[in-house]
Amino acid sequence: ADDRPQDVATILDQWQELMRTGLRLCSESSHDGSWAHLDEFIAEVDRRGWRCDILDLHCYWASGFDNMKYYYEKYGNRQIWIRELVWGASWNDNGIFATDRTFSTANQQKNLDAMKGIFNSLNNSPYVERYAYWNSEADCSKLLRGESELSLTGKYFQTMQSGMAYRKEYE
């Protein structure tokens, strides 16, 4: 995430160059607190008839992962890429961050119990093309601590069958 994102006008000034590549284009991210920024960006791209093929979300949510259809429809039926995913937000003290934030077995189990449902929702959503777990938060949320210590959620994630990501019919 970028704490000082460019304004929408600056991004749009560069967008035509990106469209010329012919590659699929992903929106700017929905960094924390940026719904209005993302709304303005998508509205302006659509108003101009420009391409934006994919919606990029950062999901530091305590709930709502089962409602990806809302974001898909709100932002013009674009496939969703979640580039940062964690159960909760450290700055809101919710989700796994409502704990003491240690790598304890109890916290690992709590995170695993929640993340199993979240992964299941995302893996079964026709609107989510891909997602990436954000591992750079407190120890209580880690998939991998250090270079080799998998958490319970990390072990689950390592063996999880997520299915096909890209679906041409949604393009």
Q: Which positions does each model-derived feature cover?
A:
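Active-site groove signature of glycoside hydrolases
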Residues: 1-8, 26-33, 49-61, 80-88, ...
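Alpha-helix N-cap and loop-to-helix initiation/capping positions
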Residues: 3-10, 102-114, 148-152
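Active-site neighborhood of glycoside hydrolase catalytic domains
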Residues: 8-27, 74-77, 118, 125
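Distinct, well-ordered alpha-helical segments
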Residues: 11, 33-49, 64-75
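Alpha-helical elements of Rossmann-like donor-binding domains used by nucleotide-donor carbohydrate transfer enzymes
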Residues: 13-14, 40, 70, 113-118, ...
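Active-site cradle of extracellular carbohydrate-active enzymes
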Residues: 14-15, 19, 26-44, 54
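Glycoside hydrolase catalytic-domain groove-lining segments
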Residues: 57-98, 120-129
